[in-house]
């Protein structure tokens, strides 16, 4: 049974990222959510070995793009009642929050994650 309707503005948890989006379709097991803003940037590295740097493949995870649609299971979608921020500003804030946490951490995993974040920010914000 669906709790939300098409057009509802929600907070969706997708992998390790958190997004504000609009429901564009209700399906039996999930909602199709169109991304409007980023609340939490996805974590970097191997999700099967969290916070470990010495892994065979250290994943670079991008935030979902503005307008990108993704399937999110019903139980991972919550109501969102606030104002929807500008996508680019929300992405800047989410990456800044992640950077601050990683700088505090100081582990090898955090250093590798910061390296990935540097690359992603150049791509996101067209920095040289």
Swiss-Prot record:
Chief subcellular location equals membrane
> Lipidated positions for S-diacylglycerol cysteine?
26
Spell out the SMART domains in the cross-references.
KapB
Q: Where is the lipid attached (N-palmitoyl cysteine)?
A: 26
* Gene3D superfamilies, per database record: Kinase associated protein B domain
Coiled-coil residues: none
* Annotated S-S bridges: none
Bilayer topology: Lipid-anchor
Alphabetized UniProt keyword annotations: Cell membrane, Lipoprotein, Membrane, Palmitate, Signal
Q: Which GO terms describe its cellular component?
A: plasma membrane
Where does the signal sequence lie? Answer: 1-25
Q: Name one Pfam family in it.
A: KapB
Protein localization:
Cell membrane
State what this protein does: May play a role in the activation or the expression of KinB.
Instruction: Please give the name of this protein.
Output: Kinase-associated lipoprotein B
Species annotation: Bacillus subtilis (strain 168)
